[in-house]
């Protein structure tokens, strides 16, 4: 009989395991503000002073790679290596770590090591990758904090490829581990693993239109269903799914074929028996499993008896050797549909040659047929993929180079610009998807120059509001998810940003001409000292904020660090950058259209992508309003009579009980504030504006900034948050 808890609970505090009724249960539409406070130092055992790049520089990189190479063929009884080589397992681990990335919001990917944590550690498509990470643990234990899990998983994939004969394109470290699940990532609404598109809360609508920003076709899959759409073995329709999914992961058709064929050159699928024999995923397993899952009761449960995807067999006859055999086999045979021992759809060649039979993974004396998945068959039957497959088949070196480059892109897409790269194997070549910025080959401006330029900027016709708006529009394109965007490069002057609707009110042709004139005059009067447009845009915003603070009575210098450079149109991939276009920006009261998500939800999402805390988000909104930095100079939320002065008027007037608020539209997306006594109109507001007086948590912080003793605090906090946003992409000064 269980003893009574001395604290008065039945057996434990129900809230420890979400057993009690929570705020979310009472108010299911409540905003999730926790995404603005995740990954705090309270969960990080390494502390706020830990400098990963500094630790990585102490790493004996060659020794680590040697240890990883040795591990590849050091088969363990508790999870024996297929064909005596763990390489294919580590490739799958690295691939699935990186493969969650999607271009829509830049989230997912390899850069945080989140495969260690829920939900990814328990996704059906990640079955048995827990074993791969356990195999790596002795090496992680040995090298400690000098190598993150995020970097180690990708490096293990690279070493695996090299150990099996592929010349890789390169590797960069710099991925920093997180220590709790990433709750900001939307994986879909389905409440069932691998739910098909006909089920409730499907990610598909219309004629198989995939919901944005999702890339995977089913909940719990990394890419597509290997058996075919919704498990239907149709290679042509599978090709359609593949093209959409890989495009949303920033891959074109050639990269898609290279990755599919290159990845499937190695290893095998596992479906030795009925999946009903497989136990629960790691998060659902008991204590004695110690974080492992998918423990199988089918015969030995490992080796040739392993059950993972349900598909059974290898693609090639030499699954631990880099070669062109994938195409040899795929393109040389007619294929027939069959089912694996686990009941999964797969394809086998008709009358295969002896040389195209594979050894059993744990018995070299036994020969088995090779297989293809429905997704593989798309590489042969989709007309576009088929042409690429044929070309790669005829040109093995081109294929090897294409795969090496695509693999590097896959595993580094969310790492950010090259200024963030660390380690001895960084490729010298600049790649367009890295959003390259030219190196600075001139002397940058000093403090004296900065003061001169600030005077010129403030005396121009742009004014405080326009200077602030230009700097914000440039810098706030940054996404901390994949470290893209930001002010460096001055891409606001280039396509596609120059033509974005969110920038239309800035009159960029005229505004940039003024800045270019200031830039040209300064540069022509100095021999080797120059100012970039990128620096000038940010400096203009900083100068305007500084003036606005002074006009509010506070003589506080706004920090500015020069060193940005100007990118060219040739260095800017227009289609790729289109994903950074804001559909809404609550900091400017901008929304491109009406969406199923509310404007306040979109604000929280934007703030999270800018890596802002709740106080930083609040102080920036309040400051931007009084600075007159709204989209199209709208008066929504401008609760002040002194526009351009950095005061706390937004909070003072929002929280003033003399004002009553009324919706002006049936949708309640705009409001007017009227004097409670006279009924006269005082202000107009958006949903975002009223959020800071409506939401209890946000109101609590807003009250701090509305206090009489917080005027200077508001200014200082705004400047700190502003400076943070201006420098979000300055990895060159963060190392």
From Swiss-Prot:
Needed cofactors: heme b
Entry's cofactor comment: Binds 1 heme b (iron(II)-protoporphyrin IX) group per dimer.
Site (described: Transition state stabilizer): 92
UniProt cross-references to PROSITE patterns, sorted A to Z: PEROXIDASE_2, PEROXIDASE_4
Cellular component, GO, one term: cytosol
Gene name of the record: katG
Oligomer status and interactors: Homodimer or homotetramer.
InterPro entries (alphabetical): Catalase_peroxidase, Haem_peroxidase, Haem_peroxidase_sf, Peroxidases_AS
EC id: 1.11.1.21
Binding, heme b: 264
Site of covalent link Tryptophyl-tyrosyl-methioninium (Trp-Tyr) (with M-249): 95-223
Function in brief: Bifunctional enzyme with both catalase and broad-spectrum peroxidase activity.
Record protein name field: Catalase-peroxidase
The record's account of how the chain is modified after translation: Formation of the three residue Trp-Tyr-Met cross-link is important for the catalase, but not the peroxidase activity of the enzyme.
Annotated crosslink Tryptophyl-tyrosyl-methioninium (Tyr-Met) (with W-95) location: 223-249
Active site: 96
Origin superkingdom: Bacteria
């Amino acid at each position: 009989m269980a003893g009574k808890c001395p604290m008065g609970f039945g057996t434990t505090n129900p809230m420890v395991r979400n057993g009690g009724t929570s705020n979310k249960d009472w108010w299911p539409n409540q905003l999730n503000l926790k995404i603005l406070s995740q990954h705090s130092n309270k969960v990080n055992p390494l502390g706020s002073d830990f400098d990963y790049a500094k630790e990585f520089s102490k790493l004996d990189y060659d020794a680590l790679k040697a240890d990883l190479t040795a591990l590849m063929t050091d088969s363990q009884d508790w999870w024996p290596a297929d064909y005596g080589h763990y390489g294919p397992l580590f490739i799958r681990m690295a691939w699935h770590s990186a493969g969650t990335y999607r271009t829509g919001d830049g989230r997912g990917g390899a850069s945080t090591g989140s495969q260690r944590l829920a939900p990814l550690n328990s996704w059906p498509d990640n079955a048995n990758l827990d074993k791969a990470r356990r195999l790596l643990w002795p090496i992680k234990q040995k090298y400690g904090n000098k190598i993150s899990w995020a970097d180690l998983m990708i490096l293990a994939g690279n070493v695996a490829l090299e150990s099996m004969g592929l010349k890789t394109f390169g590797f960069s470290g710099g991925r920093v581990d997180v220590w709790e699940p990433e709750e900001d990532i939307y994986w879909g609404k389905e409440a069932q693993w691998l739910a098909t598109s006909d089920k409730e809360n499907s990610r598909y609508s219309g004629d198989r239109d995939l919901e944005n920003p999702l890339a995977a076709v089913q909940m719990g899959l990394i890419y597509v269903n290997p058996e075919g759409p919704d498990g239907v073995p149709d290679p042509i329709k599978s090709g359609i799914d593949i093209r959409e999914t890989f495009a949303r992961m920033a891959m074109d058709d050639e990269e898609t074929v290279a990755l599919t064929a290159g990845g499937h050159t190695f290893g095998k699928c596992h479906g030795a028996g009925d999946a009903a024999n497989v136990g629960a995923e790691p998060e659902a397993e008991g204590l004695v499993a110690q974080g492992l899952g998918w423990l199988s009761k089918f015969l030995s449960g490992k080796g040739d008896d392993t059950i993972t995807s349900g598909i059974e067999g290898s693609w090639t006859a030499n699954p631990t050797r880099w070669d062109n055999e994938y195409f040899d086999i795929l393109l040389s045979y007619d294929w027939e549909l069959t089912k694996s021992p686990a009941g999964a759809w797969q394809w086998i060649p008709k009358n295969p040659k002896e040389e195209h039979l594979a050894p059993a993974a744990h018995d070299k004396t036994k020969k088995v047929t090779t297989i293809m998945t429905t997704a593989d068959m798309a590489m042969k039957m989709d007309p576009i993929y088929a042409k690429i497959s044929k070309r790669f088949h005829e040109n093995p070196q081109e294929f090897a180079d294409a795969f090496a480059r695509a693999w590097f892109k896959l595993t580094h897409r969310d790492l950010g610009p090259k200024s963030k790269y660390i380690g001895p194997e960084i490729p010298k070549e600049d790649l367009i998807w890295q959003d390259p910025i030219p190196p600075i080959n001139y002397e940058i401006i000093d403090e004296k120059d900065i003061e001169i330029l600030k005077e010129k900027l403030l005396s121009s016709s742009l004014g405080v509001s326009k200077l602030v708006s230009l700097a914000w529009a440039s810098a706030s394109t940054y996404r901390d998810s994949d470290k893209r965007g930001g002010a460096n490069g001055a891409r606001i002057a280039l396509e596609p940003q120059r033509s974005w609707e969110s920038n239309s009110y800035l009159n960029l042709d005229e505004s940039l001409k003024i800045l270019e004139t200031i830039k040209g005059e300064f540069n022509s009067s100095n021999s080797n000292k120059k100012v970039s447009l990128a620096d000038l845009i940010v400096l203009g915003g900083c100068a305007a904020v500084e003036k606005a603070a002074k006009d509010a009575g506070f003589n506080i210098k706004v920090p500015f660090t020069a060193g940005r450079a100007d990118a060219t149109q040739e260095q800017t991939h227009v289609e790729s950058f289109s994903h950074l276009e804001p559909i809404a920006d609550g900091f400017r009261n901008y929304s491109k259209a009406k969406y199923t998500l509310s404007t306040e939800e979109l604000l929280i999402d934007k703030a999270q992508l800018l890596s802002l805390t709740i106080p930083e988000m609040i102080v920036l909104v309040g400051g931007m309003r009084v600075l007159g930095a709204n989209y199209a100079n709208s008066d929504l939320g401008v609760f002040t009579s002194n526009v351009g002065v950095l005061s706390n008027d937004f909070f003072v007037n929002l929280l003033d009980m003399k004002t009553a608020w009324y919706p002006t539209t049936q949708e309640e997306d705009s409001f007017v504030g009227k004097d409670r006594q006279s009924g006269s109109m005082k202000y107009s507001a958006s949903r975002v504006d009223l959020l800071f007086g409506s939401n209890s948590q946000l109101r609590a912080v807003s009250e701090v900034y509305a206090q009489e003793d917080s005027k200077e605090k508001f200014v200082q906090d705004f400047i700190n948050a502003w400076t943070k946003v201006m420098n979000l992409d300055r990895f060159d000064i963060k190392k």
